[in-house]
């Protein structure tokens, strides 16, 4: 379900909309039946108007609503790169909020990162950014140790801590 964006800075956004509500029950019912669910970036208002939605917002809100563990975002690039051009493999939400979001100048990129932060802060454990132009990119990201994109999570994935008695079985095996 969608609502109109309205007038922003004196510009009528016409048929551009925002996600108002996701019917998670309907999506989960289909997923539980073993079906693949494709969600288009279109939304309908309560009065039947059709609105164009951003795919980032739709993906984020659907992932949050269905309590997804992962969100995979296929974009124009394979993730975030450092100043030398090397791919950054892992980032935390807090790092992005403190260090990165204010340095992004391009509105589309800022919108993407704001949506990814929103997903992370609302229960999506891992968000992967993968280059849509790489053949087999999703498989390479998910099923190789290094992956090919950038992964965002609330907390660092690798935490160093002292071993406990419960860890002995895993250490010895």
Go through the PLM ranges and name each one:
Residues 1-172:
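C-terminal catalytic "cap/lid" subdomain
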